[in-house]
């Protein structure tokens, strides 16, 4: 593909060598003459000046470099679109594989693709153009929307509802039983029936081996456009707001409520019944034990204001020496 044609597809402004051939994408340090790459952060301008790439996606204000540039407001998003251009997703033929077990009461939408050994239970509704890959199991009374995509070995439990353009990666379980038990007078634990479904709204993606538990009563809900990374646990009766990000190994205890546009970085843990408001950022490995106001950035365990936490981190390596100084001064004062 000529660079000028790629620029047109991306809506970018081409600077230099419009007739050069672009054959793929690569990171800025690995890119060669046939690759397009990107720089979204000005601090990497040095790498852009050294790159051997055939073209670099940059912001309009980015300084001139030797390599040809494609100038666009959001270089990172444009790079993502370039990947789609050069490496289109595989397509799957519509129809039902002969080994799939589809209950006669299930309704399968137009253009849906049902792979080998898929199980679809009674009274399920599968949306138009859904793609369900081998060994996916969908329990009875489930509804999934149009363009739903489930990778191999995903499971959707009974009565859950998933919207349009939802993606489940391999090994995801939606609607597994919440962790609920009641102790009797003899000290024995009794399972609490988890009666409420998990609801997954439109354009949610849940990545590999994550679990969204069903609720004991009520529902567990993942809001429109939320993105959930690998190995995430969402406890029963919790809610996750629209466009919120839960990074790898986040754990939400039951009845946790996360607002819109929040970010919980890797290995964040949240205690039950906490409310984390809109636009909150919780940095990696933090432990949240209380409610968090909108727009806050918090860190640590227990989590508190990020700026204060950074100051504490800066002091920590000096504590042994500060303690020695304190002990010397106290000894001097007592003499």
Positions of PLM-derived features:
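Structural signal for interior beta-strand "rungs" in well-ordered beta-sheet cores
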Residues: 38, 95-305
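Terminal amphipathic alpha-helical/low-complexity segments used for targeting or macromolecular assembly
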Residues: 1-99, 111, 160, 165, ...
